Amino acid sequence: MILKNNIAYAENEQEKLSFLSHITWDDAHQRNDKNQFKGAKLIQEFVKHLPHKPGVYRMVDENGKVLYVGKARNLKKRVSNYTREQGHNNRITRMIRATSHMEFVVTHTEIEALLLEANLIKRLHPRFNVLLRDDKSFPYIIITDDHRAPALYKHRGARTRKAHYFGPFASSSAVTQTINVLQRAFLLRTCTDSVLENRTRPCLLYQIKRCSAPCTHEISDRDYRELVKGAKSFLSGKSQSIKNDMVQAMHKAAKNFDFEQAAAYRDRLSALSHIQSHQGINPQTIEEADVFAIAQKEGISCIQVFFFRMGQNWGNRAYFPKADPSFSSSEILASFLSQFYDDKPLPKLILLSESIEDKTLLAEAFSLKANRKISLSLPKQGERKTLVNYAYINAHETLGHKLAETATHTKLFQGIAEIFQLPHTPCRIEIYDNSHIMGTNAVGAMIVAGKNGFIKNQYRKFNIRSTDITPGDDFGMMKEVIKRRFSRLIKEHGLPHESKNIQSKDDASFPIWPDLILIDGGKGQINSVHTILSELGLDNFMTVVGIAKGADRRAGRERFFIKGKTPFTLPPCDPILYFLQRLRDEAHRFAIGTHRAKRKKETLKNPLDEIENIGPTRKRALLHHFGSAKAIASASLEDLTKVIGISTTIAQKIYNHFNEK
């Protein structure tokens, strides 16, 4: 790395990322103290030293927070545009005025600059860039290749296992539905390898005709491999040939008076027809493509993405990128694409609803990244145009629903402010709940709601840690949750009047301090929360409301508790009551889900996990040899040493672990 006049000349990708993403607030502040400039004058000073080369620039405010990340074919020319005092739209004018420091990285090519820009925008969340929200990884279906009886699984994350991967699918529910159908059509197992190895009789899935039970050899290895081959062919787009083969097999079985087998083929055919009927539009001439369409209205953009693989429609997903209203739809779409594919596999063909700037550059960047040719196309006619139109209709309709929902939420938030006598309409509402069974596996949960709905990437869960809390003490649990939540907030950002309700790092337009706290509980819970808030000096900064069920615990008879006020109820048909119930129920759902996951993890905890040097391979060997953890615990030292991969030293550790307790 060569650094000269705040310009980094990096030799490799790692150096570029390291330099641009690890500058500290102190570094930026100290550098700005040296030049004593801000805004356009500051930028003019930097322009003097910039080369006529491609690269990435970063604009930083006085607090060291990144305002904007951009790329340029020519850094000197591009950044010079910001030195003019006039002629900019409101967004760029505000950005220039807030700039207190800049950082630069010179790259070898403009393609490198484009890829680096997308990576940094996703990592740094600059508030003046177009930001991709809800960027979850996509689920895949895998058929394993590392076992005599391949299994069918849902998969997310890295492709570390030896298997055939089919996807991406637009949603987890789409994968689950497809797997259910594949089970009915091809009878493949979905159990883990360890479960399969230790079964002595078929499970319930065999009884209901969802599995062929290779675990107990109810089917020969050869016949099972044929089922696996059929499932792979179907997922590869050869559905018609698979159905033709099944029809012939069904007729043959019926001709031989094997009506039970014929009925089985009939049911499998029905399952395949069912999934195809729910796939909507399927292309006839396109094997692999992603289709993007954007719709804009009232400053909000919706991008609809459809995934077509193996000639099949594998679902769609809607995105609402955060972008200033001054961005055009083509600018939003271009930025969205570069961020979207930053960590996702690329299809051969990408279809767009409208032209974007630097389309050729983006195609070259994607081709370089994928190590094969990637085409970006704006179709004018034919099947490709039909697919784009289909995506645009969906984007337009989804945006309409979003706008209606936002308008409804705005009215509801205004109503909440009026009912609870808040000083202003709340922007952020936090709802808390606890979940446990007689004090065991106790967890606290926090969900967050804003005017655009639930902000799920800001949900938080709290494992109750304190040993001083009596099992089942809901008040004590809530105290711990509130104390941990707001102690950390104060530690990181100071008190609300000091932080000026600064914005969340996950969403630059969303505050980190709640205007309203909702608690699932009555007077006791409210008093518990206020006790902690008083200790932290926060008692006067936010309103706390408790929602308690009525005497008969029926929905619609909730009582609301606010400190210093008489408890009250709302009319049973009041839409604000329904909304508050929905907030409460979402917190309850999240808390119960977290508790169940913790309880399940505890239940499935293997005693072998506590022993040093016992990894997955040795654990699998032990379970395969003995059949259960209980049998391992009662095994003799001599028996343990007979297990393949278990040395005398390891066997002694296992024996001591179970016999010294």
From Swiss-Prot:
Its main location: cytoplasm. Pfam families: GIY-YIG, HHH_5, UVR, UvrC_RNaseH, UvrC_RNaseH_dom. One of its GO terms (molecular function) is DNA binding. Belongs to the UvrC family. This is UvrABC system protein C. The UvrABC repair system catalyzes the recognition and processing of DNA lesions. UvrC both incises the 5' and 3' sides of the lesion. The N-terminal half is responsible for the 3' incision and the C-terminal half is responsible for the 5' incision. The gene is uvrC. Keywords: Cytoplasm, DNA damage, DNA excision, DNA repair, Excision nuclease, SOS response. Residues 52-130 form the GIY-YIG domain. PROSITE patterns: GIY_YIG (PS50164), UVR (PS50151), UVRC (PS50165). One of its GO terms (cellular component) is cytoplasm. The keyword Ribonucleoprotein does not apply. Interacts with UvrB in an incision complex. It comes from the Bacteria. Signal peptide: none annotated. One of its GO terms (biological process) is nucleotide-excision repair. Residues 240-275 form the UVR domain. It is found in: Cytoplasm.
